[in-house]
């Protein structure tokens, strides 16, 4: 499979994984042939890289959790130490016009996801005093926000569920809130900190402004697997790209362009489904049965999305 050859070359020569405490993480891999290989562990990033070059999986994941024995197959015997707090913002979950109508990676939909990521980061920093450790473009339609700190590491599923409810404004009732003088906070009558005045004001005017659209299952699961930062997204061929807050603010065109892994060369592609419009900055038009020469990253994206096949 030509795409697999491109993936192997990337992992051999260009991949830069950004994963903390590798020796305490469980890793999982989805091969190009399908299925899932779980409960793998590695002593170092170099050991991980060697394995990936040899096996060349389509998807690479690691656990949000840290374990004493990450390679143990029995979850009860892994020895759970703690877990990062992970937030997943995905265009598939955003009820916006751009995301509803998007069948392929749309810059408009991704811009909606970027705005939601910025909203989440503002809430984490300003209201919860939690600083994101890593911001990652997923390589597809969204962003992953990682928080790694002692204060969140030991949170159980119940506490994480409560945090999800807060972020999604579950049960929000403006009449229950009062401003606390001398601070840019609002509190419950029970003196429980709940957020800054601007978001509460917006929430009173429009309940949707209070909500942060995260995938709640990802955040509350203390054993969750998340796409490995620096790996290739097997649905697109783009890099799951760690970015800074400044890079997030540069916009989605900058981010997607930086995430393109296969910039060199062209490939012959036979369409099995019609495509008309921009695909990763490239204007593409093809009907079923058409054969066209496309930039490598576009052809790889279209094959992974099952729009057709790359020809030798």
UniProtKB/Swiss-Prot annotation:
One GO cellular component, as annotated: primosome complex
User: Which example biological process does GO assign this protein?
Assistant: DNA replication, synthesis of primer
Keyword Nucleotide-binding present in the record's keywords: the answer is no
Tell me which cofactor or cofactors this protein depends on. Mg(2+); Mn(2+)
Q: Which GO terms describe its molecular function?
A: DNA-directed RNA polymerase activity; metal ion binding
Which controlled-vocabulary keywords does the entry list? DNA replication, DNA-directed RNA polymerase, Magnesium, Manganese, Metal-binding, Nucleotidyltransferase, Primosome, Transcription, Transferase
| Family per record | Belongs to the eukaryotic-type primase small subunit family.
Instruction: Summarize subunit and interaction data from the UniProt record for this chain.
Output: Heterodimer of a small subunit (PriS) and a large subunit (PriL).
Protein name from the UniProt record: DNA primase small subunit PriS
Instruction: Look up and give the organism this protein is from.
Output: Pyrobaculum aerophilum (strain ATCC 51768 / DSM 7523 / JCM 9630 / CIP 104966 / NBRC 100827 / IM2)
Cite the source lineage: Archaea, Thermoproteota, Thermoprotei, Thermoproteales, Thermoproteaceae
Primary gene name: priS
